[in-house]
Amino acid sequence: MTSLDVLINKATDPTLTSDNWQYILDVCDRISADPETETKRTITILKTKLTSKDANVVLRSLSLLISIAENCGSRVKQEIATKSFLQDALVKRLSDKKLHATVKYKICEVLTQLYNAFKGDPSLKPMTDAYNKARSEHPRYFSKQTQGPSKPAKKERTQQDKDREEDELQRALKLSLQEFEQQKTGKKEPDVNKPLPEIQPEPESPPVETVATVSKVRALYDLVSYEPDELSFRKGDVITVIESVYRDWWRGSLPSGKIGIFPLNYVTPIVNKSPQDIAKEIEIENKLITEEQRKIERLLAILSSQQIETINEDEVTHLYNEIIPLRIQLGNSIDKYGARQEELKVLNQSLNSEIKLYNELLDKSISSRAKHNTGGAMYQMSPYPTEQFPGQSQPQLSQQQQHQPYAQPQQTSNYAQQSQTVPPQFTQSQQTQPQYHQSHTRTGSHQEVPQYSGYNSNNIPPPATTFNQYPPSQLQQQDTSAGFGNDVYNRAAPGQPY
Protein backbone atom coordinates (compact mmCIF):
# COMPACT_ATOMS: atom_id res chain seq x y z
CA MET A 1 0.00 0.00 0.00
CA THR A 2 1.46 3.31 -1.12
CA SER A 3 1.47 6.52 0.86
CA LEU A 4 -1.36 7.85 -1.35
CA ASP A 5 -3.57 4.91 -0.38
CA VAL A 6 -2.86 5.57 3.29
CA LEU A 7 -3.76 9.26 2.97
CA ILE A 8 -7.01 8.55 1.09
CA ASN A 9 -8.01 5.88 3.61
CA LYS A 10 -7.46 8.34 6.44
CA ALA A 11 -9.55 11.02 4.70
CA THR A 12 -12.41 8.56 3.99
CA ASP A 13 -12.29 6.61 7.24
CA PRO A 14 -15.78 5.24 8.08
CA THR A 15 -15.32 6.21 11.73
CA LEU A 16 -15.20 9.91 10.85
CA THR A 17 -18.47 11.68 11.61
CA SER A 18 -17.45 14.84 9.72
CA ASP A 19 -14.92 15.90 7.11
CA ASN A 20 -11.34 16.16 8.36
CA TRP A 21 -9.90 18.91 6.20
CA GLN A 22 -6.36 18.28 7.35
CA TYR A 23 -6.47 14.77 5.83
CA ILE A 24 -8.16 16.12 2.68
CA LEU A 25 -5.48 18.79 2.18
CA ASP A 26 -2.77 16.16 2.68
CA VAL A 27 -4.23 14.20 -0.26
CA CYS A 28 -4.36 17.37 -2.38
CA ASP A 29 -0.72 18.14 -1.58
CA ARG A 30 0.30 14.60 -2.50
CA ILE A 31 -1.45 14.80 -5.88
CA SER A 32 -0.04 18.27 -6.63
CA ALA A 33 3.47 17.01 -5.90
CA ASP A 34 3.26 14.32 -8.63
CA PRO A 35 0.19 14.85 -10.86
CA GLU A 36 1.46 12.62 -13.67
CA THR A 37 1.32 9.40 -11.66
CA GLU A 38 -0.96 10.15 -8.73
CA THR A 39 -3.98 11.59 -10.57
CA LYS A 40 -5.20 8.41 -12.24
CA ARG A 41 -4.45 6.37 -9.14
CA THR A 42 -6.52 8.77 -7.01
CA ILE A 43 -9.57 8.61 -9.32
CA THR A 44 -9.40 4.80 -9.34
CA ILE A 45 -9.38 4.66 -5.54
CA LEU A 46 -12.20 7.22 -5.29
CA LYS A 47 -14.32 5.23 -7.73
CA THR A 48 -14.03 2.22 -5.42
CA LYS A 49 -14.85 4.34 -2.38
CA LEU A 50 -17.93 5.91 -4.01
CA THR A 51 -19.42 2.49 -4.78
CA SER A 52 -19.03 1.36 -1.18
CA LYS A 53 -22.05 0.25 0.86
CA ASP A 54 -20.95 2.34 3.82
CA ALA A 55 -22.76 5.68 3.62
CA ASN A 56 -20.14 7.38 5.77
CA VAL A 57 -17.35 6.38 3.38
CA VAL A 58 -19.35 7.71 0.41
CA LEU A 59 -19.97 11.06 2.11
CA ARG A 60 -16.29 11.53 2.97
CA SER A 61 -15.28 10.50 -0.59
CA LEU A 62 -17.63 13.09 -2.12
CA SER A 63 -16.04 15.83 -0.05
CA LEU A 64 -12.58 14.66 -1.12
CA LEU A 65 -13.71 14.63 -4.78
CA ILE A 66 -14.84 18.26 -4.62
CA SER A 67 -11.59 19.29 -2.97
CA ILE A 68 -9.24 17.68 -5.51
CA ALA A 69 -11.37 18.95 -8.42
CA GLU A 70 -10.94 22.55 -7.27
CA ASN A 71 -7.34 22.40 -6.04
CA CYS A 72 -5.37 19.91 -8.17
CA GLY A 73 -5.44 21.36 -11.69
CA SER A 74 -6.81 20.45 -15.10
CA ARG A 75 -5.44 16.92 -15.23
CA VAL A 76 -7.69 15.88 -12.33
CA LYS A 77 -10.66 17.56 -14.03
CA GLN A 78 -10.01 15.55 -17.20
CA GLU A 79 -10.00 12.30 -15.20
CA ILE A 80 -13.21 13.23 -13.35
CA ALA A 81 -15.07 14.29 -16.52
CA THR A 82 -15.04 10.81 -18.01
CA LYS A 83 -18.23 8.98 -18.84
CA SER A 84 -17.24 5.80 -16.99
CA PHE A 85 -16.44 7.59 -13.73
CA LEU A 86 -19.49 9.88 -13.75
CA GLN A 87 -21.96 7.13 -14.65
CA ASP A 88 -20.65 4.35 -12.41
CA ALA A 89 -19.63 6.38 -9.37
CA LEU A 90 -22.29 9.11 -9.31
CA VAL A 91 -25.33 8.85 -11.61
CA LYS A 92 -26.04 5.14 -11.14
CA ARG A 93 -25.88 5.50 -7.37
CA LEU A 94 -29.03 7.63 -7.49
CA SER A 95 -31.00 4.58 -8.67
CA ASP A 96 -29.77 2.38 -5.83
CA LYS A 97 -32.76 1.71 -3.55
CA LYS A 98 -30.51 0.59 -0.70
CA LEU A 99 -28.63 3.89 -0.63
CA HIS A 100 -29.81 6.37 1.99
CA ALA A 101 -31.55 9.53 0.81
CA THR A 102 -29.01 11.74 2.57
CA VAL A 103 -26.22 10.31 0.39
CA LYS A 104 -28.31 10.86 -2.75
CA TYR A 105 -28.86 14.50 -1.85
CA LYS A 106 -25.11 14.85 -1.35
CA ILE A 107 -24.38 13.26 -4.76
CA CYS A 108 -26.71 15.70 -6.48
CA GLU A 109 -25.09 18.57 -4.63
CA VAL A 110 -21.64 17.42 -5.82
CA LEU A 111 -22.90 17.04 -9.40
CA THR A 112 -24.28 20.57 -9.33
CA GLN A 113 -21.04 21.96 -7.94
CA LEU A 114 -18.90 20.12 -10.52
CA TYR A 115 -21.23 21.23 -13.32
CA ASN A 116 -20.87 24.88 -12.32
CA ALA A 117 -17.08 24.49 -12.16
CA PHE A 118 -16.68 22.61 -15.49
CA LYS A 119 -19.33 24.22 -17.72
CA GLY A 120 -16.93 26.88 -19.03
CA ASP A 121 -14.63 24.26 -20.60
CA PRO A 122 -16.00 22.53 -23.76
CA SER A 123 -13.59 19.63 -23.33
CA LEU A 124 -15.41 18.68 -20.12
CA LYS A 125 -18.78 18.14 -21.85
CA PRO A 126 -19.39 14.67 -20.26
CA MET A 127 -19.86 16.50 -16.96
CA THR A 128 -22.74 18.53 -18.45
CA ASP A 129 -24.33 15.40 -19.95
CA ALA A 130 -24.15 13.54 -16.65
CA TYR A 131 -25.68 16.49 -14.79
CA ASN A 132 -28.57 16.83 -17.24
CA LYS A 133 -29.26 13.10 -17.16
CA ALA A 134 -29.29 12.94 -13.36
CA ARG A 135 -31.51 16.01 -13.12
CA SER A 136 -34.04 14.61 -15.61
CA GLU A 137 -34.18 11.12 -14.05
CA HIS A 138 -34.07 12.13 -10.38
CA PRO A 139 -35.42 15.68 -10.07
CA ARG A 140 -36.62 15.21 -6.49
CA TYR A 141 -33.07 14.95 -5.18
CA PHE A 142 -32.13 18.30 -6.75
CA SER A 143 -34.94 20.18 -5.00
CA LYS A 144 -33.88 21.46 -1.62
CA GLN A 145 -37.51 21.60 -0.50
CA THR A 146 -37.65 17.83 -0.27
CA GLN A 147 -34.88 17.86 2.27
CA GLY A 148 -35.76 18.32 5.88
CA PRO A 149 -35.77 21.87 7.24
CA SER A 150 -33.10 23.08 9.54
CA LYS A 151 -33.52 21.81 13.06
CA PRO A 152 -34.65 24.44 15.56
CA ALA A 153 -32.44 25.42 18.44
CA LYS A 154 -32.95 23.61 21.71
CA LYS A 155 -34.28 26.42 23.84
CA GLU A 156 -35.11 25.63 27.41
CA ARG A 157 -38.60 26.47 28.58
CA THR A 158 -38.18 29.55 30.74
CA GLN A 159 -40.08 30.24 33.90
CA GLN A 160 -42.00 32.97 32.06
CA ASP A 161 -43.30 30.43 29.54
CA LYS A 162 -44.42 28.13 32.32
CA ASP A 163 -46.07 31.04 34.20
CA ARG A 164 -47.81 32.17 31.01
CA GLU A 165 -49.20 28.69 30.42
CA GLU A 166 -50.34 28.52 34.03
CA ASP A 167 -52.07 31.94 33.76
CA GLU A 168 -53.85 30.90 30.58
CA LEU A 169 -55.02 27.71 32.24
CA GLN A 170 -56.30 29.59 35.30
CA ARG A 171 -58.06 32.15 33.08
CA ALA A 172 -59.76 29.39 31.12
CA LEU A 173 -60.90 27.70 34.32
CA LYS A 174 -62.24 31.00 35.66
CA LEU A 175 -64.24 31.67 32.49
CA SER A 176 -65.60 28.14 32.58
CA LEU A 177 -66.75 28.60 36.18
CA GLN A 178 -68.41 31.93 35.35
CA GLU A 179 -70.33 30.36 32.47
CA PHE A 180 -71.39 27.50 34.71
CA GLU A 181 -72.63 29.92 37.39
CA GLN A 182 -74.58 31.90 34.80
CA GLN A 183 -76.24 28.76 33.51
CA LYS A 184 -76.96 27.64 37.05
CA THR A 185 -78.77 30.87 37.98
CA GLY A 186 -82.23 31.60 36.59
CA LYS A 187 -82.32 32.72 33.00
CA LYS A 188 -84.20 35.88 32.09
CA GLU A 189 -87.23 35.53 29.86
CA PRO A 190 -86.37 36.67 26.36
CA ASP A 191 -88.03 39.76 24.95
CA VAL A 192 -90.20 38.67 22.06
CA ASN A 193 -90.42 42.11 20.47
CA LYS A 194 -86.69 42.64 20.48
CA PRO A 195 -85.16 41.78 17.10
CA LEU A 196 -82.64 39.02 17.10
CA PRO A 197 -79.08 40.02 16.25
CA GLU A 198 -77.53 38.62 13.19
CA ILE A 199 -75.31 35.64 13.82
CA GLN A 200 -71.77 36.39 12.85
CA PRO A 201 -69.69 33.36 11.93
CA GLU A 202 -66.78 33.10 14.30
CA PRO A 203 -63.45 32.18 12.77
CA GLU A 204 -62.41 28.77 13.92
CA SER A 205 -59.08 28.89 15.66
CA PRO A 206 -56.89 25.88 14.99
CA PRO A 207 -56.45 23.66 18.02
CA VAL A 208 -53.17 24.04 19.84
CA GLU A 209 -51.04 20.94 19.47
CA THR A 210 -49.54 19.92 22.78
CA VAL A 211 -48.31 16.70 24.31
CA ALA A 212 -51.69 16.32 26.00
CA THR A 213 -53.58 16.41 22.68
CA VAL A 214 -51.09 14.58 20.42
CA SER A 215 -50.16 10.99 21.16
CA LYS A 216 -48.49 9.99 17.88
CA VAL A 217 -46.78 11.81 15.02
CA ARG A 218 -45.58 10.80 11.56
CA ALA A 219 -42.18 11.74 10.14
CA LEU A 220 -42.26 14.05 7.11
CA TYR A 221 -38.54 13.79 6.33
CA ASP A 222 -35.57 11.59 7.05
CA LEU A 223 -33.50 12.62 10.04
CA VAL A 224 -30.03 11.19 10.62
CA SER A 225 -28.55 12.51 13.84
CA TYR A 226 -25.26 11.68 15.51
CA GLU A 227 -26.21 13.23 18.84
CA PRO A 228 -26.68 10.60 21.57
CA ASP A 229 -29.99 12.03 22.81
CA GLU A 230 -31.58 12.71 19.40
CA LEU A 231 -33.81 10.25 17.56
CA SER A 232 -32.99 9.19 14.00
CA PHE A 233 -35.89 8.10 11.80
CA ARG A 234 -37.04 7.63 8.22
CA LYS A 235 -39.82 9.37 6.37
CA GLY A 236 -43.18 7.80 7.25
CA ASP A 237 -42.11 6.39 10.62
CA VAL A 238 -44.68 6.66 13.40
CA ILE A 239 -43.33 8.11 16.65
CA THR A 240 -45.13 7.80 19.97
CA VAL A 241 -44.94 11.06 21.91
CA ILE A 242 -43.73 10.80 25.52
CA GLU A 243 -43.13 14.34 26.79
CA SER A 244 -42.14 17.87 25.88
CA VAL A 245 -38.44 18.53 26.54
CA TYR A 246 -37.65 21.87 24.86
CA ARG A 247 -39.80 24.53 23.26
CA ASP A 248 -39.76 22.92 19.79
CA TRP A 249 -38.50 19.45 20.72
CA TRP A 250 -40.44 16.46 22.02
CA ARG A 251 -39.31 13.11 23.32
CA GLY A 252 -40.71 10.02 21.62
CA SER A 253 -40.13 6.37 20.86
CA LEU A 254 -40.09 4.36 17.64
CA PRO A 255 -41.79 0.95 17.31
CA SER A 256 -38.30 -0.59 17.53
CA GLY A 257 -37.94 0.72 21.10
CA LYS A 258 -35.48 3.56 20.41
CA ILE A 259 -36.15 6.66 22.51
CA GLY A 260 -34.90 10.19 21.86
CA ILE A 261 -35.85 13.78 21.18
CA PHE A 262 -36.94 15.06 17.75
CA PRO A 263 -37.79 18.50 16.25
CA LEU A 264 -41.44 19.35 15.69
CA ASN A 265 -40.88 20.73 12.17
CA TYR A 266 -39.90 17.25 10.98
CA VAL A 267 -43.18 15.56 11.97
CA THR A 268 -46.92 16.00 11.65
CA PRO A 269 -49.60 14.89 14.13
CA ILE A 270 -51.59 11.76 13.40
CA VAL A 271 -55.31 12.46 13.59
CA ASN A 272 -57.23 9.81 15.48
CA LYS A 273 -59.70 7.92 13.34
CA SER A 274 -63.39 8.44 13.90
CA PRO A 275 -65.61 5.49 14.87
CA GLN A 276 -67.04 5.47 11.34
CA ASP A 277 -63.57 5.17 9.78
CA ILE A 278 -62.63 2.38 12.19
CA ALA A 279 -65.84 0.48 11.41
CA LYS A 280 -65.25 0.89 7.66
CA GLU A 281 -61.66 -0.34 7.99
CA ILE A 282 -62.79 -3.40 9.96
CA GLU A 283 -65.42 -4.13 7.33
CA ILE A 284 -62.83 -4.01 4.53
CA GLU A 285 -60.49 -6.33 6.45
CA ASN A 286 -63.29 -8.81 7.14
CA LYS A 287 -64.19 -8.78 3.46
CA LEU A 288 -60.57 -9.49 2.55
CA ILE A 289 -60.45 -12.43 4.94
CA THR A 290 -63.77 -13.99 3.93
CA GLU A 291 -64.79 -13.18 0.35
CA GLU A 292 -61.57 -12.12 -1.34
CA GLN A 293 -59.56 -14.94 0.21
CA ARG A 294 -61.77 -17.50 -1.51
CA LYS A 295 -61.11 -15.85 -4.86
CA ILE A 296 -57.37 -15.96 -4.28
CA GLU A 297 -57.52 -19.63 -3.30
CA ARG A 298 -59.66 -20.38 -6.37
CA LEU A 299 -57.16 -18.67 -8.70
CA LEU A 300 -54.23 -20.52 -7.11
CA ALA A 301 -56.05 -23.83 -7.45
CA ILE A 302 -56.70 -23.20 -11.15
CA LEU A 303 -53.11 -22.16 -11.86
CA SER A 304 -51.72 -25.19 -10.03
CA SER A 305 -53.98 -27.63 -11.88
CA GLN A 306 -52.29 -30.22 -14.06
CA GLN A 307 -55.17 -30.41 -16.55
CA ILE A 308 -54.45 -27.38 -18.67
CA GLU A 309 -57.10 -28.20 -21.28
CA THR A 310 -59.89 -27.87 -18.69
CA ILE A 311 -58.88 -24.36 -17.56
CA ASN A 312 -61.38 -21.65 -18.39
CA GLU A 313 -59.41 -18.63 -19.54
CA ASP A 314 -62.31 -16.25 -19.01
CA GLU A 315 -62.61 -17.30 -15.37
CA VAL A 316 -58.88 -16.90 -14.81
CA THR A 317 -58.93 -13.43 -16.37
CA HIS A 318 -61.95 -12.41 -14.31
CA LEU A 319 -60.41 -13.62 -11.05
CA TYR A 320 -57.08 -12.00 -11.86
CA ASN A 321 -58.69 -8.62 -12.59
CA GLU A 322 -60.57 -8.77 -9.29
CA ILE A 323 -57.55 -9.77 -7.20
CA ILE A 324 -55.00 -7.30 -8.58
CA PRO A 325 -56.66 -4.19 -7.01
CA LEU A 326 -56.51 -5.90 -3.62
CA ARG A 327 -52.73 -5.62 -3.44
CA ILE A 328 -52.85 -2.10 -1.99
CA GLN A 329 -55.33 -3.08 0.70
CA LEU A 330 -53.34 -6.19 1.58
CA GLY A 331 -50.12 -4.18 1.73
CA ASN A 332 -51.68 -1.60 4.04
CA SER A 333 -53.06 -4.32 6.31
CA ILE A 334 -49.68 -6.08 6.42
CA ASP A 335 -47.90 -2.82 7.29
CA LYS A 336 -50.49 -1.98 9.95
CA TYR A 337 -50.35 -5.29 11.75
CA GLY A 338 -46.59 -5.58 11.26
CA ALA A 339 -46.09 -2.26 13.04
CA ARG A 340 -48.55 -3.33 15.71
CA GLN A 341 -46.62 -6.57 16.17
CA GLU A 342 -43.35 -4.67 16.61
CA GLU A 343 -44.97 -2.39 19.21
CA LEU A 344 -46.30 -5.38 21.13
CA LYS A 345 -42.88 -7.06 21.03
CA VAL A 346 -41.23 -3.96 22.47
CA LEU A 347 -43.91 -3.68 25.15
CA ASN A 348 -43.48 -7.35 25.99
CA GLN A 349 -39.72 -6.97 26.35
CA SER A 350 -40.13 -3.89 28.56
CA LEU A 351 -42.72 -5.66 30.69
CA ASN A 352 -40.53 -8.74 31.12
CA SER A 353 -37.55 -6.64 32.16
CA GLU A 354 -39.65 -4.73 34.70
CA ILE A 355 -41.11 -7.98 36.09
CA LYS A 356 -37.61 -9.44 36.40
CA LEU A 357 -36.40 -6.35 38.26
CA TYR A 358 -39.44 -6.44 40.55
CA ASN A 359 -38.88 -10.13 41.38
CA GLU A 360 -35.21 -9.48 42.18
CA LEU A 361 -36.10 -6.62 44.52
CA LEU A 362 -38.83 -8.73 46.13
CA ASP A 363 -36.45 -11.66 46.71
CA LYS A 364 -33.87 -9.34 48.29
CA SER A 365 -36.50 -7.84 50.57
CA ILE A 366 -37.79 -11.26 51.67
CA SER A 367 -34.29 -12.64 52.32
CA SER A 368 -33.23 -9.59 54.34
CA ARG A 369 -36.43 -9.73 56.40
CA ALA A 370 -35.97 -13.46 57.01
CA LYS A 371 -32.41 -12.89 58.25
CA HIS A 372 -33.62 -10.12 60.54
CA ASN A 373 -36.41 -12.28 61.99
CA THR A 374 -34.07 -15.25 62.49
CA GLY A 375 -31.60 -13.09 64.41
CA GLY A 376 -34.38 -11.72 66.64
CA ALA A 377 -35.76 -15.20 67.34
CA MET A 378 -32.32 -16.52 68.35
CA TYR A 379 -31.92 -13.59 70.71
CA GLN A 380 -35.32 -14.26 72.31
CA MET A 381 -34.64 -18.00 72.77
CA SER A 382 -31.62 -17.45 75.06
CA PRO A 383 -32.10 -14.30 77.18
CA TYR A 384 -29.32 -15.27 79.61
CA PRO A 385 -26.71 -18.03 79.65
CA THR A 386 -27.44 -21.28 81.46
CA GLU A 387 -25.11 -24.08 82.46
CA GLN A 388 -25.96 -27.74 82.96
CA PHE A 389 -23.98 -29.69 85.52
CA PRO A 390 -22.98 -33.33 85.17
CA GLY A 391 -25.76 -35.68 86.19
CA GLN A 392 -28.41 -32.96 86.21
CA SER A 393 -31.13 -32.68 83.55
CA GLN A 394 -32.54 -29.51 82.08
CA PRO A 395 -35.95 -29.70 83.88
CA GLN A 396 -34.12 -29.76 87.24
CA LEU A 397 -32.35 -26.56 86.25
CA SER A 398 -35.67 -24.92 85.47
CA GLN A 399 -37.04 -26.05 88.82
CA GLN A 400 -33.95 -24.69 90.54
CA GLN A 401 -34.49 -21.31 88.88
CA GLN A 402 -38.18 -21.41 89.79
CA HIS A 403 -37.56 -22.01 93.53
CA GLN A 404 -34.73 -19.49 93.92
CA PRO A 405 -36.43 -16.09 93.75
CA TYR A 406 -33.99 -14.12 95.90
CA ALA A 407 -30.63 -14.85 94.35
CA GLN A 408 -29.06 -17.61 92.35
CA PRO A 409 -26.15 -19.62 93.73
CA GLN A 410 -22.80 -18.74 92.41
CA GLN A 411 -21.86 -21.01 89.52
CA THR A 412 -18.30 -22.08 88.87
CA SER A 413 -17.09 -22.75 85.39
CA ASN A 414 -13.96 -22.56 83.31
CA TYR A 415 -14.69 -18.91 82.50
CA ALA A 416 -14.07 -15.91 84.68
CA GLN A 417 -16.63 -15.56 87.46
CA GLN A 418 -19.09 -12.71 87.09
CA SER A 419 -19.13 -9.99 89.68
CA GLN A 420 -22.35 -9.46 91.59
CA THR A 421 -23.67 -6.80 93.90
CA VAL A 422 -25.44 -8.09 97.01
CA PRO A 423 -27.63 -5.81 99.11
CA PRO A 424 -26.59 -5.32 102.75
CA GLN A 425 -29.62 -7.27 103.99
CA PHE A 426 -28.35 -10.37 102.19
CA THR A 427 -24.73 -10.28 103.27
CA GLN A 428 -25.34 -11.63 106.79
CA SER A 429 -28.03 -14.23 106.13
CA GLN A 430 -27.18 -15.43 102.64
CA GLN A 431 -24.09 -17.57 102.16
CA THR A 432 -22.60 -19.03 99.07
CA GLN A 433 -23.48 -22.70 98.83
CA PRO A 434 -21.27 -25.32 97.22
CA GLN A 435 -22.43 -26.81 93.96
CA TYR A 436 -23.41 -30.48 94.07
CA HIS A 437 -25.27 -32.75 91.72
CA GLN A 438 -28.58 -31.81 93.33
CA SER A 439 -30.52 -28.58 93.48
CA HIS A 440 -31.64 -26.71 96.62
CA THR A 441 -34.83 -25.06 97.65
CA ARG A 442 -34.97 -22.16 100.06
CA THR A 443 -37.68 -21.83 102.65
CA GLY A 444 -38.97 -18.73 104.33
CA SER A 445 -36.26 -18.98 107.05
CA HIS A 446 -33.49 -19.34 104.46
CA GLN A 447 -32.92 -23.01 105.29
CA GLU A 448 -31.80 -25.19 102.46
CA VAL A 449 -33.70 -28.37 101.63
CA PRO A 450 -31.80 -30.75 99.32
CA GLN A 451 -33.53 -31.90 96.16
CA TYR A 452 -32.20 -35.23 94.94
CA SER A 453 -32.81 -36.99 91.69
CA GLY A 454 -36.39 -38.28 91.41
CA TYR A 455 -37.73 -35.91 94.05
CA ASN A 456 -40.66 -33.78 92.88
CA SER A 457 -40.68 -30.45 94.63
CA ASN A 458 -43.87 -29.32 92.92
CA ASN A 459 -45.91 -31.37 95.39
CA ILE A 460 -44.95 -29.02 98.24
CA PRO A 461 -45.95 -25.39 97.66
CA PRO A 462 -43.47 -22.77 98.84
CA PRO A 463 -44.38 -20.98 102.07
CA ALA A 464 -45.41 -17.36 102.20
CA THR A 465 -42.66 -14.81 102.40
CA THR A 466 -42.72 -11.47 104.14
CA PHE A 467 -41.07 -8.52 102.40
CA ASN A 468 -41.37 -5.99 105.20
CA GLN A 469 -37.72 -6.30 106.16
CA TYR A 470 -36.54 -5.19 102.70
CA PRO A 471 -36.78 -1.52 101.73
CA PRO A 472 -38.76 -0.90 98.50
CA SER A 473 -35.87 0.97 96.92
CA GLN A 474 -33.72 -2.15 97.08
CA LEU A 475 -36.45 -4.50 95.92
CA GLN A 476 -36.97 -2.84 92.57
CA GLN A 477 -33.82 -4.12 90.94
CA GLN A 478 -31.38 -6.70 92.33
CA ASP A 479 -28.50 -8.15 90.38
CA THR A 480 -28.21 -11.89 90.17
CA SER A 481 -25.25 -14.07 89.43
CA ALA A 482 -26.39 -14.34 85.81
CA GLY A 483 -26.04 -10.59 85.42
CA PHE A 484 -29.78 -9.85 84.80
CA GLY A 485 -32.24 -7.89 86.93
CA ASN A 486 -34.76 -9.98 88.84
CA ASP A 487 -37.67 -7.66 88.38
CA VAL A 488 -39.98 -10.41 89.56
CA TYR A 489 -40.12 -8.54 92.89
CA ASN A 490 -42.04 -5.75 91.24
CA ARG A 491 -44.74 -8.12 89.96
CA ALA A 492 -45.16 -10.26 93.10
CA ALA A 493 -47.60 -8.93 95.63
CA PRO A 494 -46.52 -9.05 99.32
CA GLY A 495 -47.60 -12.19 101.02
CA GLN A 496 -48.30 -14.03 97.75
CA PRO A 497 -46.30 -16.97 96.37
CA TYR A 498 -44.44 -16.24 93.17
Swiss-Prot record:
InterPro entries recorded: ENTH_VHS, GAT_dom, SH3-like_dom_sf, SH3_domain, STAM, UIM_dom, VHS_dom
Location of the UIM domain: 164-183
Bias-annotated ranges (Low complexity): 388-438
GO molecular function: phosphatidylinositol binding; protein domain specific binding; protein heterodimerization activity; ubiquitin binding
Keywords for this protein: Endosome, Membrane, Protein transport, SH3 domain, Transport
Domain VHS, residue spans: 11-142
Membrane topology: Peripheral membrane protein
Superkingdom, taxonomy of origin: Eukaryota
A Gene Ontology cellular-component term: vacuolar membrane
SS bond partners: none
Family: Belongs to the STAM family.
Protein name as it appears in the record: Class E vacuolar protein-sorting machinery protein HSE1
Gene designation per UniProt: HSE1
